[in-house]
């Protein structure tokens, strides 16, 4: 076929040059005219050449409709309109505008060359070829979980063996509730036994139908409308990473309303998020027992119930990874159970952070954590280990020592840990000027240190860039994107990001703020591609300092020969550093 390509533009003809390449490659005859060719000249040439297609491009928006209308009229007057197909494309073009002006077809921004070639060749566009294909990924694949330094392995073995020996004949209300709930889910009627182990808030809900403050039931009609809405949503998701397959990008949700959560998730999926994390209300961590049913909550945090989790799960794309947080409260084992039954892919367990900065008693959370790790192994739920005690001021070496203990403990119980250091501007960093020059070196040092000790996936959180964000949306998106680029440069497995209004939110988190950061990250990944960010020599110095600090902490804990006592006594972080052993659940552990 013969084509005349005409840039109806003073200077811009890049798109037509690219189209020329595609058409020539397909064996077509092409006449490419230069920019600023007069319409009269084009008409005269077309009368001589009699092309099958006249293809016009218009990049500049002003005056586009008038110029394009005039050109189609000139072709009509010359008798070419019925003999040639006339197609228009460019940033200023929409399909509706092309039809209105009398063109045979119009192609706007984001059109692929496959679509254009398919049109001129008279065939259907291969939709599957054009559609972005995402698949669910296993973050833990390819890792051995080997402790790479024998000296560290000796210490970690001693500490974790002591934990397992100590916990083997101890139980708690949470452990017993999880055992009961498992039987209830299999059909046994044990609600009375369950409620004997619950706080009055939970008992009143089941026996008196009294809802906790600011909690309401979701109606059947609301559920029906939700299902209809989710089914009606149809979009082609995006892939944020440019030429790399790491890191996966996770967003946090927990608006209080499962419906709102689902909509935030769908928007995040549409803009490229690979996974989502469920955050529950803070009061849920301090309440013995869990509620049931479809429930909405007026404040931050979405209530953990099997029904709520299943509702949210029903809204997820098949490729989206789903993590349910369970690591810091009085319902850790049961949360793992419900997450697994609802179809979660991942969970979150860290007894050290949960007891030093999460408000739960160390003895209680150690017992609960060991049982939770067993459940995670049984249900094949990889678990991440956030070192959020860093945000309270605990130095990274001590926080990492705790993380590695929990990771090695998980491996011994056949679970799959994911290391989660913080990419943050923590109090310890501020006090010691570790980031006085840049945010790169100390964060890189954390990764270098962990990779020297254990072969395990690394997923910085939560979110990356914490304490570097401000209320300015542009600044917030920028700092998140730069931290994401650093994670990409380090070839890390995943990252958790915040929306631009999340770190300093004084109200509801908005969907547009989620898009801010996802778009910024996509641009950062595109900008760097396979290129890497180069730290200064201080990164290696900091890394060695962190490794030494981890070893010293583990050595003290191993010598103490009592993990729980080490938590109480400040070996994983002192009160002066920001570690405050929790009180929730104190005195509830018993021998069994």
Mark where each language-model region is.
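Conserved hydrophobic helix-helix packing surfaces used for dimerization/oligomerization
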Residues: 1-5
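Catalytic alpha/beta active-site cores
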Residues: 60-64, 106, 128, 138-429, ...
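Long, compositionally biased intrinsically disordered regions
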Residues: 127-137, 158-162, 166-171, 175-177, ...
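Cofactor-cradling patches in redox/metallo enzymes
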Residues: 17-20, 24-104, 110
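C-terminal helical cap(s) of enzyme catalytic domains, especially alpha/beta-barrels
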Residues: 118-128, 360-369, 500-526
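Short hydrophobic alpha-helical runs that function as membrane-insertion/retention elements
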Residues: 30-33, 53, 105-108, 276-277, ...
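Surface-exposed amphipathic alpha-helices with a cationic face
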Residues: 24, 68-81, 237-241, 302-317, ...
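Active-site-adjacent loop and "lid" segments of alpha/beta metabolic enzymes
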Residues: 9-10, 14, 460-489, 493, ...
């Amino acid at each position: 076929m013969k084509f005349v390509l005409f840039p109806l533009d003073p200077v811009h003809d890049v798109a037509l040059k690219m189209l020329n390449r595609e058409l020539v490659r397909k064996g077509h005859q092409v006449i490419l005219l230069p920019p600023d060719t007069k319409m009269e000249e084009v008409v005269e040439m077309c009368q001589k050449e009699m092309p099958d297609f006249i293809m016009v491009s218009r990049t500049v928006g002003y005056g586009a409709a008038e110029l394009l209308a005039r050109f189609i009229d000139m072709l009509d007057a010359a008798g070419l309109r019925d003999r040639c197909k006339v197609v228009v494309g460019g940033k200023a073009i929409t399909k509706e505008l092309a039809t209105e002006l009398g063109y045979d077809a119009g192609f706007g921004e984001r059109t692929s060359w496959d679509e254009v070639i398919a049109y001129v060749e008279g065939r259907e566009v291969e939709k599957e070829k054009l559609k972005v294909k995402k698949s669910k990924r296993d973050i833990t694949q390819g890792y051995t979980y080997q402790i790479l330094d024998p000296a560290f392995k000796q210490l970690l073995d001693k500490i974790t063996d002591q934990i397992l020996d100590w916990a083997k004949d101890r139980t708690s209300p949470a452990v017993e509730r999880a055992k009961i709930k498992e039987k209830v889910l299999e059909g046994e009627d044990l609600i009375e036994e369950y409620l004997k182990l619950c706080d009055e808030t939970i008992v009143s809900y089941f026996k008196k139908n009294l809802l906790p403050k600011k909690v309401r039931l979701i109606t059947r009609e609301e559920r029906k409308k939700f299902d209809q809405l989710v089914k009606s949503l149809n979009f082609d998701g995006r892939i944020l990473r440019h030429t790399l397959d790491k890191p996966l990008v996770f967003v946090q949700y927990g608006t209080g309303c499962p419906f709102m959560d689902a909509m935030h998730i769908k928007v995040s999926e549409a803009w490229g998020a690979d996974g989502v994390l469920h955050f529950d209300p803070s009061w849920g961590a301090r309440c013995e027992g869990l509620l049931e049913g479809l429930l909405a909550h007026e404040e931050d945090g979405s209530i953990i119930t099997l029904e709520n989790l299943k509702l949210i799960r029903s809204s997820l794309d098949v490729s989206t990874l789903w993590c349910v947080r369970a690591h810091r409260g009085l319902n850790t084992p049961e949360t793992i159970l419900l997450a697994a039954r609802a179809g979660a892919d991942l969970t979150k367990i860290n007894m050290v952070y949960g007891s030093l900065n999460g408000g739960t008693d160390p003895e209680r959370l150690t017992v609960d954590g060991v049982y939770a790790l067993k459940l995670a192994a049984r249900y094949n739920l990889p678990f991440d280990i956030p070192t959020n005690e860093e945000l309270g001021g605990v130095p990274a070496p001590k926080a990492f020592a705790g993380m590695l203990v929990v990771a090695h403990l998980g491996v011994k119980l056949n679970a799959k840990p994911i290391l989660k250091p913080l990419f943050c501007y923590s109090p310890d960093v501020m006090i010691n000027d570790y980031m006085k020059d840049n945010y790169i070196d100390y964060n890189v040092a954390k990764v270098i240190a962990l990779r020297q000790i254990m072969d395990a996936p690394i997923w910085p959180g939560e979110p990356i860039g914490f304490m570097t964000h401000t209320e300015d949306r542009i600044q917030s998106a920028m700092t998140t994107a730069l931290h994401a680029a650093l994670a990409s440069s380090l070839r890390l497995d995943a990252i958790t990001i915040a929306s631009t209004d999340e770190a300093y939110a004084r109200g509801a988190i908005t969907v547009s703020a989620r898009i801010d950061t996802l778009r910024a990250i996509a641009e950062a990944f595109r900008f760097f591609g396979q290129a890497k960010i180069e730290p200064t020599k201080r990164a290696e110095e900091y890394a060695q300092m962190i490794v030494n600090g981890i070893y010293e902490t583990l050595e003290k804990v191993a010598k103490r020969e009592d993990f729980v006592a080490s938590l109480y006594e400040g070996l994983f972080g002192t009160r002066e550093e920001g570690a405050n052993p929790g009180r929730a659940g104190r005195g509830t552990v018993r021998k069994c």
